[in-house]
Swiss-Prot record:
Pathway: Metabolic intermediate biosynthesis; chorismate biosynthesis; chorismate from D-erythrose 4-phosphate and phosphoenolpyruvate: step 3/7. This is 3-dehydroquinate dehydratase. Homododecamer. It holds the Pfam family DHquinase_II. Disulfide bonds: none annotated. The gene is aroQ. It comes from Prochlorococcus marinus (strain SARG / CCMP1375 / SS120). GO terms for molecular function: 3-dehydroquinate dehydratase activity. Keywords: Amino-acid biosynthesis, Aromatic amino acid biosynthesis, Lyase. GO terms for biological process: amino acid biosynthetic process; aromatic amino acid family biosynthetic process; chorismate biosynthetic process; quinate catabolic process. The record marks 17 as: Transition state stabilizer.
Amino acid sequence: MKFLLINGPNLNLLGQREPLIYGSETLEKIELNLKKKAKLLGVELECFQSNSEGTLVDCIQQALGKVDAILINAGAYTHTSVALRDALLSTGIPYVELHLSNTHSRESFRQKSLLADRAIGIVSGFGAMSYSLALDGALDFLKSQKSGV
């Protein structure tokens, strides 16, 4: 089984960017820990980050037929990008939306997601652990789909 982790704008600055909101772990460390966990679960994990909307769309489209699920922290694009939504829906790849912070306890503009209604699940507010929970959720979803439960 293969998953793709996509991180959007400004997530490359984790560890320095507003640590009271996003925590002190770097994206590199989060990805390393998630890859270790994925390997233990028998999942190959590819990681990708970009600050560019078009590059993220290209990445999603290129995943078609290559991955079983997408874990996506679209950052601010969560609230604004019809292009990311359309790319995710056009591939038909199941995806989990995830966020480090609890977006529902923040500014009103962060409380609306253009991705959430079609995601297989949403994980928000658990800091770096949100990534691990998203991995677990996607894996459980795919296993239940295969077993028909």
